[in-house]
A protein has these predicted regions:
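Canonical tetratricopeptide repeat
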Residues: 60, 93-94, 130, 354
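Register position in tetratricopeptide repeats
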Residues: 33-34, 67-68, 100, 133, ...
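Short beta-strand->alpha-helix linker/helix-N-cap micro-motif
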Residues: 156-226, 238-247, 266-267, 304, ...
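Pro/Ala/Gly-rich low-complexity, hydrophilic intrinsically disordered segments
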Residues: 105, 109-164, 282-321, 347-416
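Amphipathic beta-strand/beta-sheet edge segments enriched in Tyr/Trp
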Residues: 91-92, 102, 110-112, 220-293
Length: 428
């Protein structure tokens, strides 16, 4: 009889320790740590069907699929988890799974969520570089899709306030001004962005569209190309222009506005003067373009528009060289030119912004998602350990007698507890 009782007791104990003590989720974690992905997936799948902790099980199942390179399945489960879990682990793996699935726009959102949750400067910079890379990839992807669906474009759906600024055509005579083709475009975009009532396409979006169009050199600046670019970018108007070097270092800037829906072109501005007056010419041309677009800036906006991004033509030319190199993914050369631009004019914010951008893209070229994953997880572990230490210290430093509950009320013969608080000081 005693033997039967002992066997029964041991059986119950084993059931309690191994049957109830280790959950499907815990088993999945063990196998995931050992890279036994099939077994981990089975246990996490079972855990997702349980009432408690299903969202965490979906997260770990998504991570398991991610490590097995089953990215669509990883996205599915990490999306379910991200609906309720707002933690670094969920956001990071969700972003990486979306990136691997080439869902760049959604991946950007997930990485931004992770960045908001993470406070490590090192991993923060890595994610910032990743975001720069993904935004570029998203522009490329969107441009490809637009070209593929070109026949389905409905001009009636294009918003009237959307504008693109095309590259300026350099007329023969001054090859040294080639960098101004992109630099002037960037200046005009920067000015138009300051005016309410119009939405301006970023220069890089224009560039990525031109990359996908694969234009012949002799068609880059013709009228049909500008119309087509406008349709593909979904804009109502395309601003374009010319740069002409004249005798005695004179310059002539011309600007036109192409109405994409009507296919009509309107002369907007002609500005001519000596090279030293270039920035006055550029500003006057900008106001003429706004007038041709039917936009009247307020007095406050006029004051903002009259501020010059730079007054150094050499800085602007170096900046244009940098843009050309950056567009070809030659980030080393681009960085050199942007540094030169800033050497000529340390206050040139457009050059500083592009310098930061190419450095991020250069960093992204060297990145490995596995390294980012490891770095982020180490950062999370260090932060958790630090918080646990702080919690222990806080408990030790604030330890005191707690008033007794009803169940612990004094009984006859008990010694009354001290009325003063007892502080425990922990010394190193």
């Amino acid at each position: 009889m005693k033997r039967l009782i002992r066997i029964y007791f041991l059986s119950c104990l084993g059931f309690l320790l191994f049957g109830c003590g280790i959950s499907n989720y815990d088993r999945g974690q063990e196998f995931l740590a050992q890279e036994e992905l099939k077994a981990a997936a089975d246990y996490f799948t079972a855990a997702t069907e349980e009432n408690v902790g299903a969202d965490e099980a979906h997260r770990e199942l998504g991570i398991t699929y991610y490590r097995g390179r089953f990215f669509p399945q990883a996205v599915t489960h990490l999306q379910i988890a991200s609906d309720t879990l707002k933690d670094e682990r969920t956001a990071l793996y969700h972003g990486m799974a979306l990136e691997q699935s080439r869902k760049y726009e959604q991946a950007i959102d997930a990485y931004e969520e992770f960045s908001a949750l993470n406070d490590s400067p090192e991993i923060g910079y890595q994610i910032k570089a990743r975001l720069a890379h993904l935004r570029n990839q998203h522009l490329i992807q969107s441009a490809k899709q637009a070209v593929q669906a070109e026949d389905q474009i409905d001009l009636t759906t294009i918003p009237e306030d959307k504008v693109a600024v095309y590259y300026f055509e350099l007329l023969p005579g001054r090859d040294d001004l080639v960098p101004l083709q992109k630099a002037i475009t960037a200046l005009v975009i920067s000015d138009l962005e300051k005016v309410r009532g119009i939405s301006v396409v970023p220069r890089l979006q224009l560039q990525r569209m031109l990359d996908q169009m694969r234009l012949q050199q002799d068609t880059v600046f013709n009228q049909e190309t500008k119309n087509r670019v406008g349709r593909l970018l979904g804009v109502a108007n395309v601003c374009a222009g010319t740069i002409e070097g004249l005798a005695d270092l004179d310059l002539r800037l011309g600007a036109t506005v192409v109405n994409v829906k009507a296919g009509e072109i309107e002369a907007a501005s002609v500005q001519q003067g000596v090279e030293s007056d270039f920035f006055d010419l550029q500003k006057s041309m900008g106001f003429d373009i706004l007038d041709a677009l039917g936009v009247t800036p307020t007095e406050k906006q006029k004051r903002v528009l009259n501020r010059r991004a730079t007054e150094s033509l050499s800085a602007l030319i170096a900046y244009g060289h940098g843009l050309a190199a950056s567009d070809k993914s030659d980030f080393v050369t681009a960085e050199q030119y942007f540094k030169l631009s800033l050497k000529e004019d340390p206050t040139f914010q457009l050059a500083l912004r592009e310098l930061d951008y190419v450095r991020l893209l250069a960093e992204a070229q060297e990145q490995n998602l596995t390294q980012i994953e490891d770095l982020a997880m180490e950062s999370a572990k260090a932060r958790t350990a630090r918080q646990q230490r702080l919690n222990r210290m806080n408990q030790a430093l604030s330890r005191q007698f707690i008033p007794p509950t009803a169940a612990d009320s004094p009984r006859e013969g008990d010694i009354n507890p001290p009325k003063s608080e007892i502080q425990v000081v922990v010394k190193n």
